[in-house]
Amino acid sequence: MTVIKSSINASKIMKYTGELPQKQLADLLLTSRPNVSHIQTGRRKMQQDIAITALNNVQSNLFKLALSHEFTELVPDVFSGKYVNQNPLSFLVMYEQEANEFSANIDAVMKILVKPASQLTTNERVSARNNLKELIDVLGWGYNLLFFASDYLNIDAYQLISEQDESWKQKKWI
């Protein structure tokens, strides 16, 4: 079941705020410095109202991605594992690799999607599920590429997405 959480342990994602002092973070989050300290250590959960303020006031795109993931899990988390090279070109290469893997199976996906869902065999459903997981990999790397490159280039990812929303509305896609 998909849920928007009322609060989260934000200690992991607070690292994406950079080297901002707690006092400055408190001002950005419209809360007290001790509350920021407790959120950073995991002693206190970050509430939705503080998260909303953080999304509006903290400049780090990676922070916004990680925060959005923690509250909804409908967007991917920041790919920051030990086997991920934190370089925009590495994100681009991984995105391309995953996109090519998905693209290689596009014919199989089409054969499944042209059939009514009620007529799919068990094997076709398993194949569809696996191909959708490949698509999730592509989207995960795509989101991470967008947010990492936006931070690298000092561009607001939210603004880019908002601009695309307008473009999609004009095209009558949404």
Q: Which sequence ranges carry the predicted segments?
A:
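A short, Lys/Arg-rich alpha-helix, primarily the initiator
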Residues: M1-T17
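Conserved hydrophobic/aromatic packing and binding residues within compact polymer-binding modules
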Residues: A10-S11, L25-A26, V36-I39
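Recognition helix of helix-turn-helix/homeodomain-like DNA-binding domains
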Residues: L30-K45
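DNA major-groove recognition helix of helix-turn-helix/homeodomain DNA-binding modules
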Residues: D49-L65
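Helix-turn-helix/homeodomain-like alpha-helical modules used for DNA recognition
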Residues: T72-G140
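Charged, low-complexity intrinsically disordered regulatory/assembly segments
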Residues: I112-I174
